[in-house]
Amino acid sequence: MKTSSLLLATTRETPADAVVISHQLMLRAGIIRPLAGGLYNWLPLGVRVLRKVEAIIRDEMNKAQAQELLMPVVQPMELWEESGRAEAYGPELLRFKDRHQREFALGPTHEEIITDLVRKEIRSYKQLPANFYQIQTKFRDEIRPRFGVMRSREFIMKDAYSFHMDKDSLQKTYEDMYDTYNRIFTRLGLDFRPVQADTGSIGGEGSHEFHVLADSGEDDIAFSSDSDYAANIELAEALAPRGERAAATEELTKVETPNKHSIEDVCDFLQLKKKKVAKTLVVKGATEEHPVVALVIRGDHDLNEIKAEKLDLVAEPFEMATDEEIQNAVGCKAGSIGPVNLSIPVIVDRTAAHMADFVCGANEDGFHFTGANWDRDATPTLVADIRNVVKGDPSPCGKGKIEIRRGIEVGHIFQLGNKYSEALNATVLNENSRAQILEMGCYGIGVTRVVAAAIEQNYDDKGIIWPEAIAPFQVCIVPMQMHKSPRVEEAVMTLYNELTAKGIEVLLDDRKERPGVMFNDMELIGIPHRIVIGERGLDKGEIEYKHRRDEKSQDIPEAEFMEFLLGKLSGN
């Protein structure tokens, strides 16, 4: 293609409302243009990238024997009511009525629709297992869409749904999809990690997320320095410290700490490090007998709410106790609470349970205890893992130390079990001709988010550096003064025609622009292989080549150039 035939909408200015680099570069490179909050037009360059991402996904899904179909974006609300998610999903589900006053929603996901289809079309166990997928537009009415297409309201997803007679069959397909996703993201050229994850609002029994590692990511990923172990920080297990707890050497002493309510205030006042202080938080309990519960973690650690709410004594969903509830249960403000002489259940983190001679609140405003020790001064109701892991913790797999990086979630796979099939009564006849509820799996990839994530991982101060597999064009040709030199024009067109005849995607910059403008645009839009042809090079019988990741260009003899370029395109 020639730039004269392409909507090349590059800009030099960085929009003020674009915070993350992918949003900035997608706007500057003419990949997208905003329409309304969280809604974007995809321009021709962007669509070329999208189609390449989709093609890789489609190829791998087809190889995995998944069947492509297409379901409506508009969904009848009665299916959401039947599944029980009509209210549970919340305001992100955009609802509306048609002219007949029937209620519909714009689909953020398609579990209900595919389950309804399967219960109508699949009758016998002989038709299973079956795995269906689509690449379709979704809509989620985000309250604050941000980061461009990273968190937009309208987006494109590949979502797949598998159906099974038993959990063993589901497990096999789940493992197949896990392997398929690894192949997809590898082919996309991304540095990613599959991580153990929480099932969230989708529900189900087992889950993995696939994260592209990038500093702009919204999720913290914990992974081992010496193995393949990786997990969302919400699920990564914090192991108990090894060895015996140190013996008590101090007496329990109450000290005055006037107006010192935060860990920082107490540590500054008492000249202590945070790891010497036990932080006590009061949360809502799960029973009438214990309406509030105390959680104790070390002062330098953060509470993990996901882990905490899975405990029997803690209310689900997780919620902090109110000031009034704390005052009624303990008799002081939140910043003065401690486990000593506490009349409510005390759940202690594994690491906090290893502390000796620690400082904690005295359950009296303006006072703390020093020299506190477990068993002697306070007895835990339960010791459990309730904190986030931190860098340097031993890896739960037993190999290496925990490292933590930011990640952008681009894929998620779930073992749903029978959550939706039971709610919608999706059954088939088993070998005994009896109706049996189906087991389900769910497998999603954010197609538009993949594009943004690829940029977050591949850019420099000049613009985008696309992974080869998803670049809008493989090669760009930048002629020097082509419109003034028939010789240059002939050489350029000859090479352009030869490359396109070989099926290579070439962008020829045939604009009447200064060379600097053309160079800047080609680097901004991130085409991997750049060719420059000019009078000076032709005089020497050479063609200039530069890869987008290289600092310097190379001059290649004309006679050798095609073989050289084909080698570069094949990765040699």
Swiss-Prot record:
The record's listing under Pfam families reads: HGTP_anticodon, tRNA-synt_2b, tRNA_edit
List, in alphabetical order, the GO biological process terms annotated in this UniProt record: prolyl-tRNA aminoacylation
- Alphabetical keyword list: Aminoacyl-tRNA synthetase, ATP-binding, Cytoplasm, Ligase, Nucleotide-binding, Protein biosynthesis
Is Protein biosynthesis one of the keywords?
yes
Intracellular or extracellular location(s): Cytoplasm
Question: What general EC class does the enzyme of this chain belong to?
Answer: ligase
Q: What is this enzyme's catalytic activity, as reactions?
A: tRNA(Pro) + L-proline + ATP = L-prolyl-tRNA(Pro) + AMP + diphosphate
Any idea which GO molecular function terms this record carries?
aminoacyl-tRNA deacylase activity; ATP binding; proline-tRNA ligase activity
Free-text comment on this protein's domains from its UniProt entry: Consists of three domains: the N-terminal catalytic domain, the editing domain and the C-terminal anticodon-binding domain.
Q: Which family does it belong to?
A: Belongs to the class-II aminoacyl-tRNA synthetase family. ProS type 1 subfamily.
Give the protein's biological function: Catalyzes the attachment of proline to tRNA(Pro) in a two-step reaction: proline is first activated by ATP to form Pro-AMP and then transferred to the acceptor end of tRNA(Pro). As ProRS can inadvertently accommodate and process non-cognate amino acids such as alanine and cysteine, to avoid such errors it has two additional distinct editing activities against alanine. One activity is designated as 'pretransfer' editing and involves the tRNA(Pro)-independent hydrolysis of activated Ala-AMP.
What NCBIfam families does the record tag this protein with? Answer: PRK09194.1, proS_fam_II
What's the protein called, per UniProt?
Proline--tRNA ligase
Origin organism is: Hydrogenovibrio crunogenus (strain DSM 25203 / XCL-2) (Thiomicrospira crunogena)
